Design a protein with these regions (language model features):
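Active-site-proximal segments of metallohydrolase catalytic domains
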Residues: 157-266
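Bacterial N-terminal signal peptides that target proteins for export
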Residues: 1-11
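Active-site recognition of the HExxH zinc-binding catalytic motif
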Residues: 307-319
Length: 427
């Protein structure tokens, strides 16, 4: 049974405010029709923004530092993660400042306030039993998913990231926790000028806003430095509804659906501009709620509702300052490219599972395709032993019982590359 964490939901006083960063969106009557984008051009992506190197005295969120030895390249890597060292078996609660963004783009309005309730009642912020899951990704079948099974025994009443971190360090069933305390703030309205945004429509008739990634990331960083409630010990979380980002000045180079970042900040009593290299560090994330059917369900069934948010929260927890570097890796999600950053969601984009009932937007798409299935869709996440090429894996034992797992889903992940350490990247 799902329940909000008792006493952990607060509403900041105030009313919705508007920040006209640029010219107001065009009138709907004079707006061009959405650009129809084929499924072949829909590529779910995420990115990172900024990065910072905390010192022991830095004013920022609670985190710990560890090292891990990679036997494949004989290198010891250091990493920072949110919370306290799991070996201490302590509980850490991070305040999450939740700011919905109501966005006018291409003559249409996409209100982040519309998706607040389904987000706050999702597995990201509520306790669930992760012993099993109903369905999991299976790209070999037409609807993109198949039956689930045993998922993460021992995580019986946990928020999603808490369960993931406990599985990663084999601490399920212990007193180790990483929890989120969401605090709601007034909605902010952003008007996107025509050159920086438009509307796109997929083959199933779902319409989304499509915004230039550079322009959007600048708006988010401006908010980090201007909002009076910004606190470096909190996570600043910005939520939108059906907004995608494009790159290279081309709306068809789509679709970034979330990012997380870190940056040194000043103002609001947080320190002077002369911090001698030790200014407060603010971590932040943006994620879009995705209507079922925007992405092709066979290719990316799990890419709906909270999938982008689960991706960004997990990556923020495992790499809050964007400085956890590892031996280069690749996966089916990014091949033939390689990455040397420990971004836990990037290897498994498009792979996930179901958890908890979702009643929001469960009808067919505008062209009549029924994609929604009545559940939330968290993304799978690659774990530290996968990036470190550890064999055996010290994470929670996989369902087969022969080794520790390499992703949160373990043996339920349909790709064998995630059932063992990955090889090195081609030279």
């Amino acid at each position: 049974m799902t329940r909000p964490i008792a006493g952990k939901l607060a509403l900041a006083a105030g009313v919705a405010i508007s920040i006209p960063f640029m010219a107001a969106a065009a009138n709907a009557a004079s707006s061009p029709a959405p650009i129809v984008i084929p499924d072949s051009a829909l590529h779910a992506m995420s990115t990172t923004v900024g990065g910072a190197k905390p010192q022991p005295s830095t004013n920022t969120l609670t985190h710990f530092f560890r090292t891990a030895f990679n036997p494949l390249d004989s290198t010891t890597f250091g990493f920072n993660m949110v919370g306290q060292d799991p070996a201490l078996r302590r509980s850490t609660t991070i305040t999450v400042d939740v700011t919905p963004l109501n966005v006018n783009v291409g003559g249409a309005t996409f209100n982040g306030t519309d998706i607040l309730q389904p987000t706050l009642t999702s597995p990201v912020f509520t306790d669930n039993d992760y012993t099993s899951t109903q369905f999991v990704s299976d790209p070999a079948v037409a609807n993109g998913h198949g039956p689930g099974g045993t998922l993460s025994p021992g995580n019986t009443s946990n928020q999603l990231e808490d369960a993931t971190m406990r599985s990663q360090f084999n601490e399920q069933g212990t007193t180790y926790h990483l929890l989120h305390n969401p605090v709601l703030h007034p909605a902010i309205t952003i008007d996107v000028p025509k050159p920086q945004g438009t509307l796109i429509q997929t083959a199933r008739g779902v319409v989304a806003g499509d915004i230039d990634a550079t322009w959007w990331s600048t708006r988010i960083q401006n908010l980090n430095n201007s909002l009076s409630y910004a606190d470096p010990t909190h996570l600043q979380l910005y939520l939108t509804d059906n907004l995608m980002l494009f790159t290279m000045n081309n709306p068809l180079n789509c679709c970034i659906i979330g990012f997380h970042g870190a940056s040194e900040v000043v103002g609001h009593g947080l320190g002077s501009t002369h911090g001698n290299g030790n200014q407060p560090i603010q971590t932040f994330a943006w994620a879009s709620y995705v209507t079922p059917g925007f992405f092709n369900p066979q290719r990316a069934w799990t890419l709906q509702d909270i999938d982008p948010l689960s991706h960004e929260i997990s990556e923020w927890a495992d790499d809050p300052f964007i400085n956890n570097f590892v031996q280069p890796w690749t996966s089916p999600a990014i091949a033939p490219a390689c990455s040397n950053v420990m971004e836990t969601g990037d290897p498994v984009v498009g792979v996930g599972f179901t958890k908890e009932t979702n009643t929001f937007r469960q009808g067919p798409t505008p062209n009549g395709t029924q994609v929604a299935d009545g559940f939330y869709h968290p993304e799978d996440e690659a774990l530290l032993p996968w990036f470190m090429r550890l064999n055996p894996s010290p994470a929670q034992t996989a369902q087969s019982g022969t080794n520790g797992r390499y992703t949160f889903m373990g043996d339920l992940n349909p790709f064998l590359v995630f059932h063992a350490p990955p090889p090195g990247c081609p030279a």
